[in-house]
Amino acid sequence: MAQVQYYGTGRRKSSVARVRLVPGDGRIIVNKQDIREYIPTEALIEMVKQPLVLTETLGSYDVLVNVHGGGFAGQAGAIRHGIARALLQVDPEFRTVLKRAGLLTRDARVKERKKYGLKGARRAPQFSKR
């Protein structure tokens, strides 16, 4: 018999996460590693679990993630976004809870490009009056 799977794609900064939810005991596997091995800080791990905690589905699904691009914070945000989207396929009733927490909205903030003539995106060279 085919196993039930739910898919969700999450994005944050330059990271893209493809998330699969499979009925299981709550393991989170990121790029074939346990989440505790892959993501270094506890705060980011809690951030990833947020959609599961809000919908009270923390122990009922195994989360299988393939993520690339960006750093740890961006990847954690992308995983969280992907999990939230996958949970919508599990039960459309979760939409109100996830939307209220802001987990369904793609965080569009990305690093602003450096402009020529400036030292950074907005930082101007030091001004000398004379």
Swiss-Prot record:
It comes from the Bacteria. SUPFAM superfamilies: Ribosomal protein S5 domain 2-like. The keyword Endoplasmic reticulum does not apply. GO terms for cellular component: cytosolic small ribosomal subunit. Disulfide bonds: none annotated. Pfam families: Ribosomal_S9 (PF00380). One of its GO terms (molecular function) is structural constituent of ribosome. Keywords: Ribonucleoprotein, Ribosomal protein. The keyword Ribosomal protein applies. GO terms for biological process: translation. Signal peptide: none annotated. InterPro entries: Ribosomal_Su5_D2-typ_SF (IPR020568), Ribosomal_uS9 (IPR000754), Ribosomal_uS9_bac/plastid (IPR023035), Ribosomal_uS9_CS (IPR020574), Ribsml_uS5_D2-typ_fold_subgr (IPR014721). Belongs to the universal ribosomal protein uS9 family. This is Small ribosomal subunit protein uS9. The gene is rpsI.
